[in-house]
UniProtKB/Swiss-Prot annotation:
L-ornithine binds at residues 169, 233, 237-238. InterPro entries: Asp/Orn_carbamoyltranf_P-bd, Asp/Orn_carbamoylTrfase, Asp/Orn_carbamoylTrfase_sf, Asp_carbamoyltransf_Asp/Orn-bd, Orn/put_carbamltrans, OTCase_ArgI. NCBIfam families: orni_carb_tr (TIGR00658), PRK00779.1 (NF001986). This is Ornithine carbamoyltransferase, catabolic. Reversibly catalyzes the transfer of the carbamoyl group from carbamoyl phosphate (CP) to the N(epsilon) atom of ornithine (ORN) to produce L-citrulline. HAMAP family: OTCase. PANTHER family: ORNITHINE CARBAMOYLTRANSFERASE, CATABOLIC, ORNITHINE CARBAMOYLTRANSFERASE, MITOCHONDRIAL.
Amino acid sequence: MNQTINLKGRSYLAEKDFSEEEILYLLDLAQKLKEKKAQGIRHRYLEGKNIALLFEKPSTRTRCAFTTACIDLGAHPEYLGKDDIQLGKKESIEDTAKVLGRMFDGIEFRGFEHEKVISLAEHSGVPVWNGLTDLWHPTQMLADFMTVKEHTGRVKGVKLTYIGDGRNNVANSLLIGGAKVGMDVRICSPQELFPDQDIVKMAEAFAEESGGKITVTSDTDKAVSGADVLYTDVWVSMGEEDKFAERIKLLKPYQVNMDLVKKTGNDNVIFLHCLPAFHDLHTTYGQNVYEQHGLKEMEVTDEVFRSKHSKVFDEAENRMHTIKAVMAATLGDLD
Protein backbone atom coordinates (compact mmCIF):
# COMPACT_ATOMS: atom_id res chain seq x y z
CA MET A 1 0.00 0.00 0.00
CA ASN A 2 1.34 3.44 -0.94
CA GLN A 3 2.23 5.11 2.36
CA THR A 4 2.78 8.51 0.70
CA ILE A 5 -0.92 8.95 -0.15
CA ASN A 6 -2.74 11.26 2.26
CA LEU A 7 -6.47 11.82 1.73
CA LYS A 8 -7.19 13.35 5.15
CA GLY A 9 -9.86 16.04 4.92
CA ARG A 10 -10.85 15.20 1.32
CA SER A 11 -14.42 14.64 0.18
CA TYR A 12 -15.22 11.68 -2.07
CA LEU A 13 -17.75 12.90 -4.63
CA ALA A 14 -16.69 11.54 -8.03
CA GLU A 15 -13.94 9.34 -9.48
CA LYS A 16 -12.69 12.14 -11.72
CA ASP A 17 -11.35 13.96 -8.65
CA PHE A 18 -9.02 11.10 -7.66
CA SER A 19 -5.82 9.88 -9.29
CA GLU A 20 -5.08 6.30 -10.31
CA GLU A 21 -2.72 5.98 -7.33
CA GLU A 22 -5.38 7.27 -4.92
CA ILE A 23 -8.02 4.85 -6.19
CA LEU A 24 -5.59 1.93 -5.93
CA TYR A 25 -4.66 3.08 -2.42
CA LEU A 26 -8.32 2.96 -1.38
CA LEU A 27 -8.67 -0.54 -2.85
CA ASP A 28 -5.58 -1.74 -0.96
CA LEU A 29 -6.81 -0.15 2.27
CA ALA A 30 -10.22 -1.78 1.83
CA GLN A 31 -8.55 -5.18 1.45
CA LYS A 32 -6.52 -4.63 4.62
CA LEU A 33 -9.63 -3.58 6.55
CA LYS A 34 -11.51 -6.61 5.24
CA GLU A 35 -8.71 -8.85 6.52
CA LYS A 36 -8.71 -7.09 9.91
CA LYS A 37 -12.45 -7.64 10.25
CA ALA A 38 -12.15 -11.32 9.31
CA GLN A 39 -9.40 -11.76 11.92
CA GLY A 40 -11.31 -9.88 14.61
CA ILE A 41 -8.67 -7.13 14.79
CA ARG A 42 -10.10 -3.81 15.97
CA HIS A 43 -9.70 -0.90 13.57
CA ARG A 44 -11.47 1.98 15.28
CA TYR A 45 -9.87 4.80 13.31
CA LEU A 46 -12.94 7.04 13.80
CA GLU A 47 -13.31 6.60 17.56
CA GLY A 48 -15.64 9.27 18.95
CA LYS A 49 -16.64 10.69 15.55
CA ASN A 50 -20.25 11.43 14.61
CA ILE A 51 -21.37 10.75 11.04
CA ALA A 52 -24.54 12.07 9.35
CA LEU A 53 -26.10 9.71 6.82
CA LEU A 54 -28.40 11.75 4.55
CA PHE A 55 -30.78 9.72 2.39
CA GLU A 56 -33.08 11.45 -0.10
CA LYS A 57 -33.25 8.09 -1.89
CA PRO A 58 -33.92 4.88 0.04
CA SER A 59 -31.29 2.15 0.04
CA THR A 60 -30.47 -1.25 1.47
CA ARG A 61 -26.79 -1.79 0.67
CA THR A 62 -25.60 1.82 0.93
CA ARG A 63 -27.32 2.45 4.26
CA CYS A 64 -26.21 -0.86 5.76
CA ALA A 65 -22.66 -0.48 4.45
CA PHE A 66 -22.21 3.04 5.84
CA THR A 67 -23.83 2.10 9.15
CA THR A 68 -21.72 -1.01 9.76
CA ALA A 69 -18.59 0.77 8.51
CA CYS A 70 -19.17 3.59 11.00
CA ILE A 71 -19.66 1.18 13.90
CA ASP A 72 -16.62 -0.95 13.02
CA LEU A 73 -14.53 2.23 12.83
CA GLY A 74 -15.78 3.41 16.24
CA ALA A 75 -18.02 6.21 14.94
CA HIS A 76 -21.68 6.93 15.65
CA PRO A 77 -23.93 6.95 12.53
CA GLU A 78 -27.04 9.16 12.54
CA TYR A 79 -29.55 8.33 9.79
CA LEU A 80 -31.54 11.26 8.35
CA GLY A 81 -34.16 10.28 5.76
CA LYS A 82 -35.99 12.49 3.28
CA ASP A 83 -38.55 13.46 5.93
CA ASP A 84 -35.84 14.42 8.45
CA ILE A 85 -33.86 16.90 6.35
CA GLN A 86 -34.87 19.98 4.38
CA LEU A 87 -32.12 20.30 1.73
CA GLY A 88 -33.55 23.21 -0.19
CA LYS A 89 -37.20 22.86 0.86
CA LYS A 90 -37.45 24.98 4.01
CA GLU A 91 -33.72 25.57 4.43
CA SER A 92 -31.07 26.10 1.78
CA ILE A 93 -28.52 23.36 1.20
CA GLU A 94 -25.79 25.84 2.15
CA ASP A 95 -27.41 26.56 5.53
CA THR A 96 -28.10 22.88 6.19
CA ALA A 97 -24.49 22.04 5.34
CA LYS A 98 -23.16 24.66 7.75
CA VAL A 99 -25.37 23.35 10.57
CA LEU A 100 -24.44 19.72 9.96
CA GLY A 101 -20.76 20.63 9.75
CA ARG A 102 -20.94 22.09 13.27
CA MET A 103 -22.44 18.89 14.68
CA PHE A 104 -20.94 16.07 12.62
CA ASP A 105 -17.42 15.06 11.64
CA GLY A 106 -18.41 13.63 8.26
CA ILE A 107 -21.48 13.50 6.00
CA GLU A 108 -22.74 10.85 3.59
CA PHE A 109 -25.33 11.91 0.99
CA ARG A 110 -27.47 9.71 -1.24
CA GLY A 111 -29.93 11.53 -3.44
CA PHE A 112 -30.74 12.96 -6.84
CA GLU A 113 -28.96 16.15 -8.01
CA HIS A 114 -25.17 15.93 -7.91
CA GLU A 115 -25.06 19.67 -7.19
CA LYS A 116 -26.44 18.96 -3.71
CA VAL A 117 -23.51 16.80 -2.66
CA ILE A 118 -21.11 19.37 -4.12
CA SER A 119 -22.79 22.11 -2.09
CA LEU A 120 -22.63 20.00 1.09
CA ALA A 121 -18.90 19.54 0.56
CA GLU A 122 -18.32 23.23 -0.18
CA HIS A 123 -20.17 24.56 2.86
CA SER A 124 -20.01 21.95 5.63
CA GLY A 125 -16.28 22.11 6.35
CA VAL A 126 -16.10 18.33 6.85
CA PRO A 127 -15.48 15.38 4.50
CA VAL A 128 -18.56 14.50 2.43
CA TRP A 129 -19.05 11.12 0.74
CA ASN A 130 -21.29 10.51 -2.26
CA GLY A 131 -23.50 7.47 -1.62
CA LEU A 132 -25.14 7.97 -5.05
CA THR A 133 -26.38 10.85 -7.16
CA ASP A 134 -28.01 10.93 -10.58
CA LEU A 135 -24.57 11.46 -12.13
CA TRP A 136 -22.11 9.27 -10.19
CA HIS A 137 -21.96 6.24 -7.87
CA PRO A 138 -18.31 6.30 -6.72
CA THR A 139 -18.61 4.05 -3.65
CA GLN A 140 -20.19 1.37 -5.86
CA MET A 141 -17.29 1.62 -8.30
CA LEU A 142 -14.78 0.91 -5.53
CA ALA A 143 -16.70 -2.18 -4.43
CA ASP A 144 -16.88 -3.34 -8.05
CA PHE A 145 -13.15 -2.93 -8.60
CA MET A 146 -12.30 -4.58 -5.28
CA THR A 147 -14.37 -7.59 -6.36
CA VAL A 148 -12.71 -7.62 -9.79
CA LYS A 149 -9.27 -7.57 -8.16
CA GLU A 150 -10.19 -10.37 -5.75
CA HIS A 151 -11.31 -12.64 -8.60
CA THR A 152 -8.88 -11.72 -11.40
CA GLY A 153 -5.86 -10.59 -9.39
CA ARG A 154 -5.66 -7.17 -11.03
CA VAL A 155 -7.56 -4.13 -12.26
CA LYS A 156 -5.17 -2.77 -14.90
CA GLY A 157 -5.88 -4.30 -18.29
CA VAL A 158 -9.09 -5.98 -17.15
CA LYS A 159 -11.73 -6.12 -19.89
CA LEU A 160 -14.98 -4.94 -18.29
CA THR A 161 -18.19 -4.87 -20.31
CA TYR A 162 -21.16 -2.95 -18.97
CA ILE A 163 -24.31 -3.87 -20.86
CA GLY A 164 -27.67 -2.12 -20.55
CA ASP A 165 -28.59 1.52 -19.88
CA GLY A 166 -25.36 3.33 -20.76
CA ARG A 167 -26.48 6.71 -19.40
CA ASN A 168 -26.90 5.85 -15.75
CA ASN A 169 -24.69 6.71 -12.79
CA VAL A 170 -23.16 3.23 -12.51
CA ALA A 171 -22.10 3.28 -16.17
CA ASN A 172 -20.63 6.76 -15.69
CA SER A 173 -18.63 5.67 -12.66
CA LEU A 174 -17.37 2.51 -14.35
CA LEU A 175 -16.32 4.57 -17.39
CA ILE A 176 -14.35 7.14 -15.42
CA GLY A 177 -13.08 4.82 -12.68
CA GLY A 178 -12.05 2.16 -15.19
CA ALA A 179 -10.30 4.74 -17.37
CA LYS A 180 -8.41 6.04 -14.35
CA VAL A 181 -6.97 2.62 -13.45
CA GLY A 182 -6.18 1.41 -16.97
CA MET A 183 -9.08 -0.94 -17.67
CA ASP A 184 -10.49 -1.83 -21.08
CA VAL A 185 -14.04 -0.54 -20.47
CA ARG A 186 -16.78 -1.35 -22.98
CA ILE A 187 -20.22 0.23 -22.67
CA CYS A 188 -22.78 -1.70 -24.69
CA SER A 189 -26.26 -0.26 -25.12
CA PRO A 190 -28.70 0.82 -27.81
CA GLN A 191 -27.65 4.13 -29.36
CA GLU A 192 -30.57 5.89 -27.68
CA LEU A 193 -28.99 5.05 -24.31
CA PHE A 194 -25.33 5.76 -25.08
CA PRO A 195 -23.45 7.61 -22.31
CA ASP A 196 -23.19 11.39 -22.36
CA GLN A 197 -20.50 12.35 -24.88
CA ASP A 198 -18.74 14.68 -22.44
CA ILE A 199 -18.28 11.79 -20.00
CA VAL A 200 -16.99 9.54 -22.80
CA LYS A 201 -14.46 12.20 -23.83
CA MET A 202 -13.35 12.61 -20.22
CA ALA A 203 -12.92 8.83 -19.91
CA GLU A 204 -10.92 8.68 -23.15
CA ALA A 205 -8.55 11.36 -21.85
CA PHE A 206 -8.01 9.49 -18.58
CA ALA A 207 -7.54 6.20 -20.45
CA GLU A 208 -4.84 7.77 -22.59
CA GLU A 209 -2.91 8.62 -19.42
CA SER A 210 -3.37 5.22 -17.77
CA GLY A 211 -3.04 2.91 -20.77
CA GLY A 212 -6.72 2.01 -20.63
CA LYS A 213 -9.22 1.74 -23.45
CA ILE A 214 -12.79 3.01 -23.89
CA THR A 215 -15.35 1.53 -26.29
CA VAL A 216 -19.01 2.51 -26.69
CA THR A 217 -20.99 0.21 -28.97
CA SER A 218 -24.43 -1.23 -29.62
CA ASP A 219 -22.90 -4.52 -30.86
CA THR A 220 -23.21 -7.10 -28.07
CA ASP A 221 -20.94 -9.68 -29.74
CA LYS A 222 -18.14 -7.14 -30.14
CA ALA A 223 -18.61 -5.80 -26.60
CA VAL A 224 -18.43 -9.12 -24.77
CA SER A 225 -15.68 -10.83 -26.79
CA GLY A 226 -12.83 -11.73 -24.43
CA ALA A 227 -14.44 -9.95 -21.47
CA ASP A 228 -13.19 -10.67 -17.95
CA VAL A 229 -16.22 -9.00 -16.37
CA LEU A 230 -19.85 -8.65 -17.45
CA TYR A 231 -21.78 -5.98 -15.58
CA THR A 232 -25.40 -4.90 -15.81
CA ASP A 233 -27.87 -2.79 -13.87
CA VAL A 234 -31.63 -2.26 -13.78
CA TRP A 235 -33.27 -1.19 -17.01
CA VAL A 236 -35.37 1.47 -15.32
CA SER A 237 -33.79 3.70 -12.68
CA MET A 238 -35.62 5.10 -9.65
CA GLY A 239 -38.00 7.84 -10.79
CA GLU A 240 -38.30 6.51 -14.37
CA GLU A 241 -40.99 3.88 -13.78
CA ASP A 242 -43.21 5.42 -16.48
CA LYS A 243 -40.64 4.35 -19.10
CA PHE A 244 -40.89 0.59 -18.51
CA ALA A 245 -42.45 -0.41 -21.85
CA GLU A 246 -40.02 1.76 -23.81
CA ARG A 247 -36.96 0.42 -21.93
CA ILE A 248 -37.99 -3.22 -22.23
CA LYS A 249 -38.32 -2.82 -26.00
CA LEU A 250 -34.92 -1.13 -26.21
CA LEU A 251 -33.00 -3.32 -23.79
CA LYS A 252 -34.39 -6.84 -24.19
CA PRO A 253 -31.66 -7.66 -26.75
CA TYR A 254 -29.11 -6.58 -24.09
CA GLN A 255 -30.19 -9.04 -21.41
CA VAL A 256 -27.28 -10.89 -19.76
CA ASN A 257 -28.11 -14.55 -20.36
CA MET A 258 -25.98 -17.68 -20.63
CA ASP A 259 -25.68 -17.35 -24.42
CA LEU A 260 -24.10 -13.93 -23.91
CA VAL A 261 -21.81 -15.29 -21.18
CA LYS A 262 -20.59 -18.01 -23.56
CA LYS A 263 -19.90 -15.41 -26.26
CA THR A 264 -17.16 -13.96 -24.05
CA GLY A 265 -15.11 -17.08 -24.77
CA ASN A 266 -13.93 -16.87 -21.16
CA ASP A 267 -15.04 -19.70 -18.88
CA ASN A 268 -13.86 -17.66 -15.88
CA VAL A 269 -15.74 -14.46 -16.75
CA ILE A 270 -17.37 -12.93 -13.68
CA PHE A 271 -20.81 -11.35 -13.53
CA LEU A 272 -21.46 -8.23 -11.43
CA HIS A 273 -24.60 -6.23 -10.62
CA CYS A 274 -24.98 -3.41 -8.08
CA LEU A 275 -28.36 -4.88 -6.99
CA PRO A 276 -31.27 -5.15 -6.61
CA ALA A 277 -31.55 -7.38 -9.68
CA PHE A 278 -34.77 -8.47 -11.34
CA HIS A 279 -33.91 -12.08 -12.18
CA ASP A 280 -37.03 -13.90 -10.92
CA LEU A 281 -40.60 -13.38 -9.71
CA HIS A 282 -39.85 -13.38 -5.99
CA THR A 283 -40.59 -9.66 -5.53
CA THR A 284 -43.71 -7.53 -5.82
CA TYR A 285 -41.84 -5.47 -8.41
CA GLY A 286 -41.02 -8.57 -10.45
CA GLN A 287 -44.61 -9.78 -10.27
CA ASN A 288 -45.90 -6.42 -11.50
CA VAL A 289 -43.49 -6.41 -14.44
CA TYR A 290 -44.56 -9.95 -15.34
CA GLU A 291 -48.26 -9.08 -15.18
CA GLN A 292 -47.86 -5.91 -17.25
CA HIS A 293 -45.12 -6.93 -19.70
CA GLY A 294 -44.88 -10.74 -19.59
CA LEU A 295 -41.22 -10.82 -18.53
CA LYS A 296 -40.09 -13.31 -15.87
CA GLU A 297 -36.51 -12.00 -15.96
CA MET A 298 -35.19 -8.60 -16.95
CA GLU A 299 -31.58 -7.40 -17.14
CA VAL A 300 -30.12 -10.78 -16.12
CA THR A 301 -31.50 -14.31 -16.21
CA ASP A 302 -31.85 -16.33 -13.04
CA GLU A 303 -29.49 -18.90 -14.55
CA VAL A 304 -26.64 -16.39 -14.80
CA PHE A 305 -27.46 -14.73 -11.48
CA ARG A 306 -27.12 -18.05 -9.64
CA SER A 307 -24.22 -19.40 -11.72
CA LYS A 308 -20.55 -19.83 -10.82
CA HIS A 309 -19.87 -16.63 -12.77
CA SER A 310 -21.93 -14.48 -10.41
CA LYS A 311 -19.99 -12.62 -7.73
CA VAL A 312 -22.77 -10.19 -6.83
CA PHE A 313 -22.82 -11.02 -3.12
CA ASP A 314 -19.04 -10.64 -2.79
CA GLU A 315 -19.58 -7.29 -4.51
CA ALA A 316 -22.37 -6.33 -2.09
CA GLU A 317 -20.22 -7.21 0.94
CA ASN A 318 -17.36 -5.18 -0.49
CA ARG A 319 -19.54 -2.07 -0.36
CA MET A 320 -18.89 -2.10 3.40
CA HIS A 321 -15.13 -2.62 3.17
CA THR A 322 -14.57 0.04 0.49
CA ILE A 323 -16.82 2.59 2.21
CA LYS A 324 -14.90 1.92 5.40
CA ALA A 325 -11.66 2.62 3.52
CA VAL A 326 -12.99 5.92 2.15
CA MET A 327 -14.14 7.07 5.59
CA ALA A 328 -10.96 5.99 7.36
CA ALA A 329 -8.68 7.55 4.74
CA THR A 330 -10.47 10.90 4.64
CA LEU A 331 -11.38 11.30 8.31
CA GLY A 332 -9.32 8.88 10.39
CA ASP A 333 -5.79 8.83 11.76
CA LEU A 334 -4.14 5.88 10.02
CA ASP A 335 -0.60 6.48 11.32
